């Protein structure tokens, strides 16, 4: 073999090895199931000829010839799904041949498209500065992501108040807890848990708005009869230098009344899963939502179960201060500067939102009644203790019976919230399950 032929052969082998070493491309696939978009992840190498990969966690095999891609996915139940697409740069478009949902012997064709997801930039976790230009009034999987981030990345951004007003007093969005986002978190898939670390919350204006109200759930008939003149707006002055707030036009008994601020996020959510309609930013669920839990503040880590590729994280409805339950219907509603980072916990079951501070584990139960919310909080805490500490139900009952505290987190929404709290210092006496995730310390 001549030296020229040898050099060419080595060059080809080197190029082939380099392609083999490249990570497979990731695509976000949108399949139109009779007008209902389903979002799934496709992992596939860029090579020509035979290809293998995964679609929504299931294995696939196929071929790529030029810009034409054919592959078959085999589901865990043995069902097959056949895809054919044409690639144009970072986009795929084609048809998916699925089993008919009502008759397994029949097939149904569905159009689909896909966009190629970006590769992680070199250099490790990054700091992103994001200035929002539009806001969401639904927790929806259909809204285009405003930013793509990776586990370990941090984001600095801002939120509006619940009325859609920004730091300069300008109305920027429709009232009703407009949210910043969604943020697409790479590596987050359905069945995972998204950990959101609240690194910084800062007031960015000198006032907040509230009401002189008491929510109906907190009123006796006698008190309700006296409260007919309430529900009037109350503006609060925020002294950012001293970290305190007072009713702006207070007279009489409250003319010298000041309270220390304790900034928090009322809204924090990921997108609901397939089959669920987009959810109002005033509502809550296991995905988070308008939780109005005053422990979601600087230094806390919030854990939310992921139901869509990329999680699709929303945040907003910041409060300068809120008492337990948000009994005035509106807390001290204001805009906020926010910094957060994200991590992904793979393949972890979680029934309800969790919050971890430096000193406590907290589970937020939500339901149509306080009884239902209490049950959800108790079940969620029992699940956490079993997962992270390996406790049996008997052992969990002993820990809860001796040490748990319950607080009413929210009374102002369509559903109510009850939080179960445990001091982490007590649990230092119990050995953790090796490898379980840790949040705030």
What name fits each language-model region?
Residues 7-15:
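Bacterial N-terminal signal peptides
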Residues 21-89, 93-103:
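Central antiparallel beta-sheet cores of small beta-barrel/beta-sandwich binding domains
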Residues 121-171:
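N-terminal, Lys/Arg-enriched amphipathic/low-complexity engagement segments
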Residues 131-140, 172-179, 279-287:
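Short, structured beta-strand/loop micro-motifs enriched in basic residues and often containing a Trp
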Residues 162-173, 201-211, 310-320, 409-412:
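Short, Lys/Arg- and Gly-enriched loop/turn segments at beta-strand edges
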Residues 203-296:
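Intrinsically disordered, low-complexity linker/loop segments enriched in Gly/Pro
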Residues 261-290, 294-371:
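Conserved mixed alpha/beta catalytic, RNA-binding, or beta-rich assembly cores of soluble enzyme
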